[in-house]
């Protein structure tokens, strides 16, 4: 069942699509997971990088209550449910929730699906979630701090939020034309970028780290995973060999 919650206020701010809307060729990494065919037995944090079986950021998940922020097409949630977790998914897009439900049905697992803004988590009691996970979704948020505060409220003390985001260095570059990638924006430029139907809000690593700290998370892991070359995904570009495409962060809820 999909539970409907009130959506949050609309996002504001300018949008630029410079360097991110490819007329043809690879899918922009910032659009991940888009319609990519992903496994349903392991969590994938981004295109062409090691997955949870290598990174081991979540720990044992069987019997755990895990919040997934952003449904994607359901692969992350189904992978966790297949491992025995009770998975709660929040997303503001009906089509993504329906895709997650269809994938769960096809794999004979259950998901608890909620429609609403990622910061509207009042339906979850405080200190009841064992882990939270977001794959390339928090980069689409204008107000990251608000979401992190709400996630911190519902996590048990010591429990982790693991998230992946488009790496800010990769968002500086445009590789849509032949030849070397071009730098099209400063590293610290916060202007939103249009990527397909989404908007990406670039943040430096320092800004992400500070947002976690303000929400009472202790960051214990920051990863810039190297790309893997064995089976390139639809997101693959040579630029991924020059700068990291995905940033992965884990923060644990500190005690009061």
Feature map (PLM): residue ranges:
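Class I SAM-dependent methyltransferase SAM/SAH-binding core
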Residues: 65-120
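A short glycine-rich, Lys/Arg-flanked "PGG" loop and its adjoining helix->strand segment in the class I
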Residues: 145-160
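Short alpha-helix
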Residues: 198-222
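A short acidic, Gly/Pro-enriched loop at the edge of an enzyme's catalytic core
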Residues: 119-132
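Core SAM-dependent methyltransferase catalytic element
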Residues: 215-217, 234-256
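A short SAM/SAH-binding and catalytic strip from SAM-dependent methyltransferases
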Residues: 130-145
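Conserved class I S-adenosyl-L-methionine
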Residues: 1-62, 75-79, 103-107, 160-191
